[in-house]
């Protein structure tokens, strides 16, 4: 976030460091996730870089809880973190047993299928779609080609029956387009998978210059977590490998004409 808004405001690391009373190497360490600024420094960054209040609040919470490896917050708060992870991290892996991940959804899917999962107001749906668009466009605009792997349960594809045929076709074409990109891979799990394998994402810095620390994102009904604890990340890595082993390529799944999807949408 520091790097993003410093670049956006056209300021150097030395300039920001001088304002905050630290050297430019310290600012560089913040931007490379080697060190976390303290709360006072976050307040200074927010002021001088004109960081939006919501993001500033999130950064303050991170600074206050720097020692915690499992950062708990509501979905909206942690979604702001995911937005930046998708802009800067080098490896992005997502599993979802019920829905197509937001960065791969079409407008029709967002407004036609997502509302069936819970009651959303029109304003919430509108804001949610705007946020998904921002995230997907920022990710696809990256020139460093981060590795993106999506593993989706075939339940998510069978739920396309709730859309009209043109909208089903558009969503499948969206998935096929993303899968065709050299740095993207979409795979489908069409068999039983481990109990408790609810949706989660793994983000890694990889080769990205400004990628954040490795972490796992997961959520329950009223909260979500960004997990940096190595032993817990390892358990999610193990689960990811199980799911990967049970998955097949999107093209293979569609070519099998499972549930008529490939036949309806060549």
Region annotations inferred by a language model:
Residues 164-266:
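C-terminal regulatory/effector modules of DNA-binding transcriptional regulators
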Residues 3-19, 24-25, 29-159, 238, ...:
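Interdomain hinge/linker segments and adjacent boundary elements that couple functional modules
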